């Protein structure tokens, strides 16, 4: 029965995304919600200018509808599911506002860094308030062991850092056709397996709903992309995967399973530090995926390589938690 629920969930998420896309993409095009491309980016990306963005709306709709329908068939909506849906929708709305300012108000940078940070913090604080209300654990566990450490009030700081940092890390990865869609499907798939292994079936259902939604989106987002998810999708996915890691007490393992997102973020941090301290850049461009483009790799080769890296890291994460 449970296996059937998981199968139907991923199929439903996939089909909703696939069926919504042919409706939403022309609608976004008519509204002229096209992506503007930074001039300092790779020259090969200039031809993507005008590609409909904010496609993350179809991902979020697919996740919400699929999760609610399948959860009600399996059990009642749990506090964990409420938190997952809240964070996904909250960060998705923040990303939508950022995208709207970029494409409609023609402010290419969207929300200022300060405005976006304030929004991310507010959502994280509300999340933790609800998390604390339901008396969820404030300990952090060492993957593959029974060792755990209660952080007490300091767990709030960790949650804040993870949600803000994690959503931004996933957002940075969304720079090539299909890159984030593929790596997200792999990472959420890994967490679905681990949540299932812990008998957290509601979290597993949510996770596979995301897998189905992003795979359906990937049909139209693979190179050459017909639509981009925008910050609407990337911030929502970032918030969602961090929330899953918190609810499954796999905060540390997120660094491995989400290793591609971590590496992308580190490449930006190292680039900034190097340039400010030495005046030299480590990479031709950051995040890292742009560096490989500029050394001559095709966009598709970069994407597939990062997918492969994400898959290896996901398998490693599962191995550490389940079999080590």
Swiss-Prot record:
EC class (word): transferase
GO MF annotation terms: metal ion binding; phospho-N-acetylmuramoyl-pentapeptide-transferase activity; phosphotransferase activity, for other substituted phosphate groups; UDP-N-acetylmuramoyl-L-alanyl-D-glutamyl-meso-2,6-diaminopimelyl-D-alanyl-D-alanine:undecaprenyl-phosphate transferase activity
EC number annotated for this UniProt entry: 2.7.8.13
Spans traversing the lipid bilayer: 5-25, 50-70, 77-97, 117-137, 147-167, 176-196, 203-223, 227-247, 250-270, 302-322
Key words, A-Z: Cell cycle, Cell division, Cell membrane, Cell shape, Cell wall biogenesis/degradation, Magnesium, Membrane, Metal-binding, Peptidoglycan synthesis, Transferase, Transmembrane, Transmembrane helix
Cofactors, names only: Mg(2+)
Membrane topology: Multi-pass membrane protein
Reactions catalysed, as given in the entry: UDP-N-acetyl-alpha-D-muramoyl-L-alanyl-gamma-D-glutamyl-meso-2,6-diaminopimeloyl-D-alanyl-D-alanine + di-trans,octa-cis-undecaprenyl phosphate = di-trans,octa-cis-undecaprenyl diphospho-N-acetyl-alpha-D-muramoyl-L-alanyl-D-glutamyl-meso-2,6-diaminopimeloyl-D-alanyl-D-alanine + UMP
GO BP of this protein: cell division; cell wall macromolecule biosynthetic process; cell wall organization; peptidoglycan biosynthetic process; regulation of cell shape
Gene Ontology terms: cellular component: plasma membrane
Record keyword Nucleus present: no
Subcellular compartments: Cell membrane
Domain of life: Bacteria
Keyword NADP applies: no
One Pfam family, short name: Glycos_transf_4
Known pathway: Cell wall biogenesis; peptidoglycan biosynthesis
NCBIfam families: mraY
Function recorded in the entry: Catalyzes the initial step of the lipid cycle reactions in the biosynthesis of the cell wall peptidoglycan: transfers peptidoglycan precursor phospho-MurNAc-pentapeptide from UDP-MurNAc-pentapeptide onto the lipid carrier undecaprenyl phosphate, yielding undecaprenyl-pyrophosphoryl-MurNAc-pentapeptide, known as lipid I.
Recorded family membership: Belongs to the glycosyltransferase 4 family. MraY subfamily.
Name listed for the protein in its UniProt record: Phospho-N-acetylmuramoyl-pentapeptide-transferase
Organism: Bacillus subtilis (strain 168)
Gene that encodes the chain: mraY
């Amino acid at each position: 029965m449970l296996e059937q629920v998981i199968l139907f969930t991923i199929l439903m998420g996939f089909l909703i995304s696939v069926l919504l896309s042919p409706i939403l993409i022309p609608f976004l095009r008519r509204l002229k919600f096209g992506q503007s491309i930074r001039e300092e980016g790779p020259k090969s990306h200039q031809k993507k200018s005008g590609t409909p963005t904010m496609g993350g709306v179809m991902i979020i709709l697919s996740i919400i509808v699929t999760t609610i329908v399948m959860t009600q068939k399996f059990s009642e909506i749990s506090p964990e599911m409420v938190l997952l849906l809240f964070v996904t929708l909250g960060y998705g709305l923040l990303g939508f506002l950022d995208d709207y300012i970029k494409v409609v108000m023609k402010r290419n940078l969207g929300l200022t860094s300060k405005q976006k940070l304030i929004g991310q913090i507010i959502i994280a604080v509300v999340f933790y308030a609800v998390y604390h209300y339901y008396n969820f654990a404030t300990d952090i566990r060492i993957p593959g062991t029974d060792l755990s450490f209660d952080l007490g009030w300091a767990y709030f700081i960790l949650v804040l850092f993870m949600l803000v940092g994690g959503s931004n890390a996933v957002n940075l990865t969304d720079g090539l056709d299909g890159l984030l869609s593929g790596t997200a499907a792999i990472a959420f798939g890994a967490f679905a397996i681990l949540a299932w292994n812990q008998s957290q079936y509601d979290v597993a259902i949510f996770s596979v709903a995301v897998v189905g939604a992003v795979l359906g989106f990937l049909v139209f987002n693979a190179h050459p992309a017909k639509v981009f998810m925008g910050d609407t999708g990337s911030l929502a996915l970032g918030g969602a995967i961090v929330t899953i890691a918190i609810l499954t007490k796999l905060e540390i393992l997120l660094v491995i399973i989400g290793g591609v997102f971590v590496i992308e973020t580190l490449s930006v941090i190292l680039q900034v530090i190097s340039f400010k301290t030495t005046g030299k850049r480590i990479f031709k461009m950051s995040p890292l995926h742009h560096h490989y483009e500029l050394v001559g790799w095709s966009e598709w080769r970069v994407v597939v390589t990062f997918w492969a890296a994400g898959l290896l890291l996901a398998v490693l994460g599962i191995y550490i938690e389940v079999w080590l």
